[in-house]
Amino acid sequence: METETVTGYVDHIIYRNAENGYTVLVLVVNEEELTCVGTFSDIAEGENIEAHGEYTEHATYGRQFKVVSFEEKEPEDEMAIERYLGSGAIHGIGLALAARIVRRFKKDTFRIIEEEPERLAEVKGISQRKAMEIADQVNAKRDLREAMIFLQQYGINMNLAVKIYNKYGGEIYSVLKENPYRMADDIDGVGFKTADELAARVGIKTDSDFRIKSGIQYVLQQAAMDGHTYLPMEELTRRAVYLLGVESSQVEAHYMNLAMDRKIVMQLKDDITQIYANTFYYMEANTAVMLKQLDVTYDVPDIEIEAAIRNIEKKTEMELDEHQAEAVKEAVRNGLLVITGGPGTGKTTTINTIIKYFELEGMDIFLAAPTGRAAKRMSETTGYEARTIHRMLELNGGMDTGSTAGFERNERNPLETDVIIIDEMSMVDISLMYSLLKAVVAGTRLILVGDVNQLPSVGPGSVLKDIIDSGAFHTVKLTKIFRQASTSDIIVNAHKINNGEEVSLDNKSMDFFFLKRYDADKIINVTLQLIKQKLPKFVNATEYDIQVLTPMRKGLLGVERLNGILQAYMNPADKSKREKEYRGTIFREGDKVMQIKNNYQIEWEIRTKFGLCVDKGMGIFNGDTGIIEEINDFAETMTISFDEGRKVEYPFKLLEELELAYAVTIHKSQGSEYPAVVIPLLSGPRMLMNRNLLYTAVTRAKKCVTIVGDEQTFYEMIQNNSQQRRYSGLRDRIVEETI
């Protein structure tokens, strides 16, 4: 991009986003008006600026100047000074007062304000107090202007520069030059990598103490994104050495200091030193304690429970098998129960019977699941209202950033109910489990339901698996495939996959198909035909309801390539559809998209077709999908309708948290259910291409599974029971609590 420079004064501001500073304004340049767009720090009408950027042609609004950076210039002639002071930029000065000030001090006005502010009292209508207030405002604007220039010379964009200035004010000079790594802790949007680049520019040594400490914490943060709550010391050191380019002894020398600063916790287990980020250690430890506190027993005679079960069976015309009946009994007798089982094993019937039992006892029951889709499905199968765990806990938007959850319901304001049933527990990570348990008081029954053979949560921890593996709590495993489920080859084959048994690929099934193709492009062509022509009629659904699931993000059959191809096929470019390009991805009106990061501060609304708001709240979560309804370049937002009809005005600045969702990774699909799924399949890394992944993909389909690809890879995945190691200590914490 060839940068151009324009100089002029701000005639008027058309639009300004107070949250991120995005502004559309009219700049008068050589007596001609020019529309400028960009992020402006605290700019006001009447100000003189020198702007750097490029001319662009907007499809709707015509010629614009897209500003990359700018500097405010003090007005040089008396007319410009008067225009600036009277513009409203300085609170308390109107047009008449501005004229009197300039008439008195002429071109010397700004020097007087900055160096001899008390002299402003010479002007009629200005007291000594008001004179100092005016000077303070002018000086604050000068400080901000100088800070912006200072930060931009280090490559910091204007949006981030405003955040940094708002956090540190005049301290930014010392922070940036002495320890820029503070920013990674203090400011959302500044991670270790950004701070490290800034540190290199200002000459911070690569082996400085605060760089190594910050690097260690960054490695633990990245490990959490991979699902780990801790790393063994040897592994942490290896990763930190690779990241920082220093010696292992230099890394190890900082562990004790970080522990003393309460940034990390070091735990010795079986001769291995486990190193936790402080937060995750205490989440695991307190989760174990709270689980044990809920694990109480209730003395209810078997004969009484069995009589109630028979009564419910008679009314519902459903008969429980012995494991289901045992689950109901355990739910009545225990404060904490885990129910696990694969598809078609009667989890829903069991949950419904438990609900009806407690309902007959006059007890209040809350139902919840980790995602909106899972909660909706729970509502449909039980006939009772189910909410997301976040909504049940009354998410309040969290702390200072978009990625930290805060809930109204906690130990000081617990959930007021007798029974809580959580479905799809395999998706619950340690952070959400900790928040849930804080809001559950002793005496409340907690029933955790899930399929332990599904992939673990996207977030850190292996909560369901660790709870079961601890052996500390009552657990009922449902194994029988019921008659109505046994007619579905999706369910039958899912269990065969889970057990490592051979699956027939003769395509004689009514809901499970394998189309053999061995070339990526041929696989893609078949996938397109299935989505556009075959499957919508076969499963009575729209093409948007059919989901492509793939093991990987990269590669010929990865999410990134498939989404570009599927978008062009399903939602091609059209003059009537507005678009927004972001880092190589085109987002278009009508696109299917997915949120890829928890954001607890995005506001949403549910409205009727007449525009009446019937519900509103906060939070869009990792894995939530939606459709882009409208793109507004002027406001720099797009309207997205997410699951459950939640409409969001999604700002462009958050587009790094959004991606196309015509194809998604199997891991991201966890907890969702689709009428039909298409799984393109070729060989890949052994640790990824395993039984667990294939089982999860197949169980996402309600009516039809179609796998397109190499049958050898399919069979190898069934036989490959290896899984990537996930470092999680909840099981050990629970065992310690029971000793």
Predicted feature residues:
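Structural detector for short beta-strands of small beta-barrel domains
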Residues: 2-17, 53, 625-629
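C-terminal accessory regions
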Residues: 614-617, 622-739
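Conserved helicase motor core of SF1/SF2 NTP-dependent helicases
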Residues: 353, 357-363, 372-379, 390-398, ...
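Accessory alpha-helical DNA-binding modules that contact the DNA backbone or grooves
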Residues: 22-30, 35-36, 44-54, 59-273, ...
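Conserved helicase motor core of P-loop NTPases
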Residues: 452-618
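Conserved RecA-like ASCE P-loop NTPase motor core of nucleic-acid helicases/translocases
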Residues: 337-379, 449, 512-517, 534-555
